[in-house]
């Protein structure tokens, strides 16, 4: 099984990411609709800079987060935990990803919030549909492993 492909297929079917940032001794989390790009292994989202999490992020920050479904039974639990970096996009890169975001979420056409990229360095995918407690791990610098 191609671990990253399996993770990517599942992430492409979801739409809400929880991401957390810190500054000094303060932590804060936010939720956002996202577009997942399997080529860059990254999430793209819109978020205002004036929010608490936007202020804490600045132009770039370390980030951790989750994506999870809402299954009715333990046997169907699937979810991702990740850590990496979040950065604000600009110029052509922002325009390109905004276009892709608006294609998936047409209501976003009305929003002027900046586009952000969450680029995970590490992903852990729990997939109980493959067996209770089955974990797939991916690291940007190392590829894939299973547990």
From Swiss-Prot:
Domain of life: Bacteria
NCBIfam families per UniProt: PRK03467.1
Family from the record: Belongs to the UPF0306 family.
Name of this chain's protein: UPF0306 protein KPN78578_35330
Organism of provenance: Klebsiella pneumoniae subsp. pneumoniae (strain ATCC 700721 / MGH 78578)
Lineage: Bacteria, Pseudomonadati, Pseudomonadota, Gammaproteobacteria, Enterobacterales
